[in-house]
């Protein structure tokens, strides 16, 4: 059986409290000093020790890693050593890079063509920086439905998707098998939410040990187990002193006691096993609360933000302000609005600035 450790690495670009009335460039919306400060903190606590641990591991540790386009930008600007470490691990086959919307955005909730375009942008940037073109797709928070699977296959030519193993969709079936989308040839690798949540919520409290966790994994029947987490779980959400990296350090050794279990990348696992069944996902799933989109679309503020994004998208793209709009489409912003009026107000001010800039450029083009 194959064990895939899938990590999403992302640092959102934070919006300024009061953006300029009109944008000279898209990044005028951003609090760059805050972005750099937070990036450097997380890089020191999480990204550097994580990559060093993978490099030093002698028991076959591999990662499936999605690094958002905006985080890759920050690494280029403020942490080039991280790019070098990552490139080395990719070249050695220790890390498989996964592609998705460049801005870690909710593009799939807005327009199919936006999801396709942002993913192509992400693939191109990874190719430029790492010399590889990812063949595996995942959405932020593992958002997925049949429509996404069809787009990934037909428009992007990618054959593997990592998605949430929602009990609502699986029914009596287990997430520990390769499935196939009914709308395409896309192979689905499904996150095991129980094993994933055990690390997220149990590791920092001392409830999870590498030896007992390895034993649990070894007893699962199936083809593949996907444990999916934010990369920042290790070192940022769960500090090093609470055992975050010790768990990862010792897990490969403990798993080596069970020769039928091995670390794999998504491409390796998907090519090794034939799908056991088709899995129809008519309504979106995610790894968020409720295993659906309610954590992104359930509040009036979130509904209002989505309406604003839909209203401005075509106008922004045709006015040369695509990046500004795409920065506002970051999934983190929408997720945070469910409990924060302050986040929505920053978003609304930025949207007003974008709207004014669109109008100004329209007048200039007509003059």
Describe the function of each predicted region.
Residues 2-7, 13-111, 135-138, 159-164, ...:
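Short, well-structured secondary-structure segments
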Residues 10-12, 69-73, 102-105, 142-145, ...:
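Short, solvent-exposed loop/turn segments at secondary-structure junctions
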Residues 47-54, 83-87, 116-126, 149, ...:
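Generic structural signal for well-ordered alpha-helices
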Residues 49-50, 77-90, 169-181, 208-217:
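Alpha-helical scaffolding within the catalytic cores
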Residues 106, 166-170, 189-207:
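Positively charged, amphipathic and often flexible ligand-engagement surfaces
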